[in-house]
């Protein structure tokens, strides 16, 4: 667990692969080149050793991408509680702006054709190339846990290094929700993500704070306020 998030197991040595894993390449590649391996042989057959990669436990479930925003200037709303040397201090407001899931070619339809072994014998390999984004709302009972994870992520970012100002603005928790209704966070993107594109007119989540609030407008809003000297203070 890191920053309050439960994460899939990461393997450092491909020889340790003894069950389904997903191999991902570094950078925002839209899923291109990712592949599933069940053992070292699978890994060697598909890996591009010239690229930096991560081997991660493959978790079955629904993938949801949670778009949050952290505003260090706001003193109202859901306040992130500091930890460590920031314990007892409010660091700023956390907002859930929107949520999406990704359409991926061709893994979303692969299961209809048979087992992975059979398909590979036929020369077919699943791919995870992102082709689109769909708006999502999740079960309300999952929202408290979503905020706990996001709050822990922001609080932990203030402790990454001395004098750190933490993670400011938009970020995305890339998650899997299992059939036991548990979150696994497989990646954190400290930026605006493409999944926010369906919400240029706002979302059911952002409308709680202000109607028609997109991630882009939220960035513009806090940037505008930060230019007013009387409102800017990073002292903790």
Feature annotation, model-predicted:
Residues 67, 161-180:
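A short glycine-rich, hydrophobically flanked beta-strand micro-motif that places a catalytic Asp/Glu
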Residues 22-24, 67-68, 181-192:
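A short beta-strand motif that forms the metal-chelation/ATP-contact edge
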Residues 217-236:
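Cysteine/selenocysteine-centered motifs that mediate thiol-based redox chemistry or coordinate metal-sulfur cofactors
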Residues 28-30, 172, 193:
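Gly/Ser/Thr-rich loops at beta-strand to alpha-helix junctions
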Residues 95, 173-174, 181-186:
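Conserved active-site beta-strand-loop modules that form the wall/rim of enzyme catalytic pockets
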Residues 68-158, 189-220:
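ATP-dependent carboxylate/phosphate-activation module, predominantly the ATP-grasp catalytic core
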Residues 1-101, 136-156:
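Active-site nucleotide/adenylate-binding loops and adjacent lid/helix of ATP-dependent enzymes
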Residues 31, 64, 181, 194, ...:
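Active-site-proximal flexible loops/turns
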């Amino acid at each position: 667990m890191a920053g309050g998030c439960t994460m899939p197991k990461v393997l450092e040595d491909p020889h340790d692969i003894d069950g389904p894993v997903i191999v991902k390449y570094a950078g925002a590649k839209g899923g291109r080149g990712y592949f599933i391996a069940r053992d070292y042989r699978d890994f060697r057959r598909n890996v591009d050793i010239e690229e930096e990669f991560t081997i991660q436990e493959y978790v079955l479930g629904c993938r949801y991408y949670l778009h949050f925003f952290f505003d260090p200037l706001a003193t109202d709303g859901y306040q992130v509680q500091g930890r460590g040397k920031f314990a007892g201090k409010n660091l700023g407001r956390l907002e859930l702006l929107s949520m999406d899931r990704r359409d991926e070619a061709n893994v979303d339809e692969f299961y209809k054709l048979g087992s992975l072994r059979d398909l590979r014998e036929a020369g077919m390999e699943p791919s995870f190339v992102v082709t689109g984004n769909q708006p999502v709302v999740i079960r309300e009972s999952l929202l408290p846990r979503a905020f706990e994870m996001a709050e822990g992520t922001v609080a932990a970012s203030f402790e990454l290094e001395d004098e750190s100002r933490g993670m400011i603005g938009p970020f995305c928790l890339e998650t899997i929700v299992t059939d036991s209704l548990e979150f696994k966070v497989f990646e954190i993107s400290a930026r605006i993500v493409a999944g926010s594109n369906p919400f240029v007119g706002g979302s059911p989540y952002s409308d709680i704070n202000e109607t028609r609030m997109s991630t882009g407008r939220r960035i513009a809003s806090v940037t505008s306020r930060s230019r007013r000297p009387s409102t800017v203070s990073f002292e903790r």
